């Protein structure tokens, strides 16, 4: 469970308004990533694929994350299944545990909703990165609940290298 300062950082981050930083960059990125995502998850309808990519770009950039790192994390967490539920109850694309809804103060949020799930996941990861003094490996392990072990971060990095980086 998060401590009080983490809880407050998360609430502050989620309350901010966010949008694309650079429209041209976003359009180029969306086209490239859409082709890659269609190869990786061909059953996702095109409109849902674009929504997933737009939300990933929007919240990753807004929270200071690499959008492709977020895509690699989503691949490892749910294999792009927005309705995925893990054996421990984590939900959606970024496998968010339901307790986060109460921590954030929005108990009625739908974690299967693409935007909600990606917004939560990006906010949580960005705070872990901040807490870990920008050590992304440790932050990824914290995100997964496997702090101190390298298996999960290495899976994310492998997906990032193989499919999401040029």
Locations of regions flagged by a protein language model:
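Catalytic glycan-binding domains that act on GlcNAc-containing polysaccharides
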Residues: 7-9, 14-166
